[in-house]
Amino acid sequence: MLKRWILPLFIACLSFSQIAKAELELVITEGVNSARPIGIVPFKWHGEGKLPQDISAIISSDLQRSGKFSPLPTNKMPQTPYKDADINYEAWTKMGVDAIVTGEVKVNAAGKYEVSYKLIDVVRGQLTKGKSKGLSNSGELVLTQDHILVNKIATLSKTQLRKYAHRISDVVYEKLTGEKGAFLTRIAYVVVNDKSQHPYQLRIADYDGYNERLVLKSKQPIMSPAWSPDGKKLAYVSFENRRSQVFIMNIYTGKRELIASYPRHNGAPRFSHDGKELAIVLSKTGSLQVYIVNLQTKKMRQITRGRSNNTEPFWAPDNKSLIFTSDRGGKPQIYRVNLEDGSTKRLTWQGSQNLGGQITPDGKYIVMVNRSETGFNLAKQDLETGAVQVLTKTLLDESPSIAPNGGMVIYSSIYRKQNVLSMVSIDGRFKARLPATNGRVRAPAWSPFL
């Protein structure tokens, strides 16, 4: 029964050790050599002392973590040009690099930082020698420089430098892949310190672990954080009143709203993609069942019924259906329910158990926890063909959460007998860990685009 499966997970939530007092620290474990080479030339710093943020290093790390790019190490670059006129295109193409990023940082009279950068198509630059021409609107032949894909400048404060570096990564990623970047997003997660007066803490950080911030602390367990579509609120489960309750909290004001406090179990909150409704799981009638709450009227409707346990709802991109985990077939598998007519279909068949499913933003795949002979690992299933690909080889994987662009998945796993957060690209090639420098972390939730 699913209750037997949920209980060990709940007990595990009570057994975390130290809190992550420092920021999460990302460690790349696999996939660097299989990605597309790119040159992120160190930005030229026109100032005294050290640049407050190493912008080029941040961009390199972002693109590497996407699993699609392999930034060339600085010591292996054929040159470090700061102007496109100085680029030796042939030297870069010999290194297998077809795009490079160059930039400069200056301090203006007002003490602000002026950051300029260019994304350059090396292949086109080599063909045209950086001097391609075309017709202007007036019909004149002019220098077009169409090998320069992006040419931007921004004036920033010191505190904005790191954020802008992520913005550059987003621009470069989208220009080269055609997909939106997710480097300006955040993650929410739960940390626990048994020695603290408030051992259970809900925290948020940039997707790469920087700028960690405490959102909520409690003497009782906190579970299942989920972001609102606007990125301003978190829904979560709290046991602060000695029973499970579902709350929604504004992460900027701290204002909280109680959504569900029924007898027995209240859990697994998940916002609809338009933010108007919240799917939750209640056991007020006996077994676990999925409900939907209208967040404006507070009216609630029951979605699943029967004697089986149904939990872990997740909305389809069009908000017209939900996937959920159910033990109606004996062991946990993932099903889909049509919210208009209530019809239900089993989706997963490969593996003795499949649970914790999420649908990718394009609606093509489910990412889930798949149990096989090797244990609990993340897997991806094609919703059209049913083909399944196991993405991870880590231990006791759980709680997958997909980046808003569908390119990466963050999840909880075990490493050296400790709970850590891990990342894997949606194709399974790139892998990384985000262990806290002091403590254990679980229940990750990736924010929407911010």
UniProtKB/Swiss-Prot annotation:
Pfam families documented for this protein: PD40, TolB_N
Superkingdom of origin organism: Bacteria
GO annotation, biological process: cell division; protein import
Localization in the cell: Periplasm
Signal peptide: 1-22
InterPro entries for this protein: 6-blade_b-propeller_TolB-like, PD40, Tol-Pal_TolB, TolB_N
GO cellular component: periplasmic space
Quaternary structure annotation from Swiss-Prot or TrEMBL: The Tol-Pal system is composed of five core proteins: the inner membrane proteins TolA, TolQ and TolR, the periplasmic protein TolB and the outer membrane protein Pal. They form a network linking the inner and outer membranes and the peptidoglycan layer.
Family of this protein: Belongs to the TolB family.
Stored NCBIfam families: propeller_TolB
Name used for this protein in its record: Tol-Pal system protein TolB
Organism, scientific name: Aliivibrio salmonicida (strain LFI1238)
Gene symbol of the encoding locus: tolB
